[in-house]
Amino acid sequence: MRIGGVEIAVARNQLKTGAALSYINLIIGNLIPLVYTPIMLRLLGQAEYGLYGIAQSIMGYIGLLNFGIGGTIIRYLSKYRAAGDRGREERVAGLFIKIYSVVCCLILAAGFLFAANLQIYSRSLTADEVATLRVLVILMTVNTAVFLPFSVFSSLVLAHERYVFHKLLGMLSSLAAPLLNLALLFCGFGSVGLVASSTVLNFITYGSYTAYALRKL
């Protein structure tokens, strides 16, 4: 596929601007925790923060079920886009959506299995804390599983070298997350509020990737 001079210039501009936004996002990502974390800990409390940390650790292991497929998706999508083979590009995207749908079921099964067997923490946690931990694990599991297939559209945006949109969306998400988290904590929603915040942001972020990919690519 021959690429015109204008398209090359646009691609270079996307790359340069995307790189600049990456550095800005990196700075934001390092500065925000310095301000956000102490406030969050004070509002959440050590005990509930501990529960949130345990739930995140459990989800870290469950998240390994995605097998690091993201990089593979981008590689194949970029390959067929460079070759100008729109048909294969769409088939690959569809294939990975199906694969992720299967992985989604595995994550749901693993998450609910963990949630049903949290009695192993009964010696170190109270009954109420175990109940809260169970709610957190279930919500995080559903959050991870439901949005996983839609990550294909994020990969599609990157494969088409739309770095500016991708990085801007990531930066806005990085800024919105602590603000929404603190708002929910001030309202007394605790650790469950943090998971709800993550769910809302995932819905907006992946919804934006999906809409952009379907309309612009």
Model-derived regions: residue spans:
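Membrane-interface junctions at transmembrane-helix termini in multi-pass inner-membrane proteins
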Residues: 16, 145-172, 182, 192, ...
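C-terminal transmembrane helix end/exit motif
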Residues: 2-4, 11, 27, 73, ...
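Signature of the first transmembrane helix
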Residues: 14-78, 107-112, 143, 173-178, ...
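N-terminal membrane topogenesis motif
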Residues: 1-32, 87-94, 131-133
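Transmembrane-helix boundary and interhelical linker motifs in polytopic inner-membrane proteins
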Residues: 8-13, 45-47, 62-102, 119-124, ...
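Alpha-helical transmembrane segments of multi-pass membrane proteins
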Residues: 113-116, 126-150, 167, 171-175, ...
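Alpha-helical transmembrane segments of multi-pass membrane transport and lipid-handling proteins
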Residues: 95-124, 179-183, 187, 208
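Short alpha-helical transmembrane interface motifs in multi-pass membrane proteins
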Residues: 17-22, 42, 58-60, 99, ...
